């Protein structure tokens, strides 16, 4: 990785400068030297130094300016800490609207397209949890639940367990992550936001057949992308299940307000399905 710094020299005063020189060094090592010669009063020069960044370390940049008729050397110092690596911002989103939302197929279609898209498929993790009442998610705060709708509405999504939701509109019937109005575009903006930790999570199911119970064993490896002096890192595990209300139901019904609509690509097939669509499992 490289870093650019620009020095601008303005000559002011009654006389110009003789044999002006600008030196650029990084971490005490010479990178560039410019012989500017004689500079007249009012003259301006801008010079850019390009330096390699040492990953994981503090890099100190120094500009030193001298001239024969200048009494002292003028120095400008700056520093930057280079990332040891550039981690991928992985995005977890939860679709949290209530059961039988007739516009949910827009969200389902968008999720499916994003999971097929090379720019999203390795860093986008959607969960369709369909919750609309307190108590279904022990990790959620009262504020989190207070933002949920009381009845079936257009599908809502909570990115990264925030208390401000996002959602889908008619524009999302055409998958286009370059369109600033779409859900996919907004999620792409989130993924592009720098992150400074890389977390690898591994887990396995442990089933106890004798009493029909299941537990999960998880481990996490955390790597900071830059030195965090005295920082204490805490990792929280959130176990989610793609729950579409099948427990205790003979079948699950998906209302489908898009049935029979004229949409490019048939919204992945949803426009060709009836309203309601019965016995549907969506994961």
Describe each region flagged by the PLM:
Residues 2, 44, 56-60:
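Extracellular Ig-like/FN3 beta-sandwich strand-entry sites
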Residues 2-6, 213-215:
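Short coil/turn motif common to extracellular beta-sandwich-like domains
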Residues 9-14, 222-226:
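Asparagine-centered strand-capping/turn motif at beta-strand->loop junctions
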Residues 23, 122, 127-283:
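Short, conserved sequence motifs used for protein processing/export or organelle targeting and
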Residues 25-55:
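Intrinsically disordered, low-complexity Pro/Gly/Ser/Thr-rich segments with frequent PxxP/GP/PP motifs
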Residues 29-35, 73, 164-167, 246-247:
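Surface-exposed loop/edge segments in extracytoplasmic proteins
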Residues 55-85:
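Terminal connector regions
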Residues 85-129:
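Local sequence-structure signature of Cys/Sec-based thiol-disulfide redox active-site neighborhoods
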């Amino acid at each position: 990785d490289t870093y650019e710094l620009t020095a601008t020299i303005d000559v002011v005063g009654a006389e110009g400068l003789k044999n002006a020189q600008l030196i650029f060094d990084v971490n005490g090592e010479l990178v560039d030297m410019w012989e500017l010669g004689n500079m007249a009063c009012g003259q301006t020069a801008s010079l850019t130094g390009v330096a390699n960044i040492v990953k994981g370390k503090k890099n100190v940049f120094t500009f030193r300016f001298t001239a024969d008729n200048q009494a002292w050397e003028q120095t400008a110092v700056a520093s930057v800490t280079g990332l040891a690596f550039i981690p991928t911002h992985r995005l977890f989103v939860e679709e949290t609207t209530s059961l039988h939302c007739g516009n949910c197929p827009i969200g389902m279609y968008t999720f499916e397209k994003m999971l097929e898209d090379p720019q999203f498929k390795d860093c986008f993790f959607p969960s369709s949890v369909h919750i609309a009442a307190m108590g279904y998610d022990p990790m959620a705060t009262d504020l989190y639940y207070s933002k949920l709708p009381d009845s079936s509405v257009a599908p809502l999504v909570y990115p990264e367990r925030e208390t401000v939701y996002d959602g889908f509109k008619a524009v999302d019937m055409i998958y286009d992550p370059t369109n600033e109005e779409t859900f996919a575009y907004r999620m792409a903006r989130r993924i592009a936001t720098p992150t400074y930790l890389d977390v690898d999570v591994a887990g396995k199911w442990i089933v106890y057949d004798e009493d029909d119970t299941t537990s999960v064993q998880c481990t996490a490896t955390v790597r900071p992308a830059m030195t965090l002096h005295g920082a204490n890192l805490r990792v929280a595990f959130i176990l989610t299940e793609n729950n579409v209300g099948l427990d205790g139901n003979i079948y699950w019904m998906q209302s489908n307000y898009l049935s029979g609509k004229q949409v490019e690509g048939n919204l992945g097939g949803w426009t060709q399905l009836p309203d309601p669509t019965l016995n549907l499992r969506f994961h």
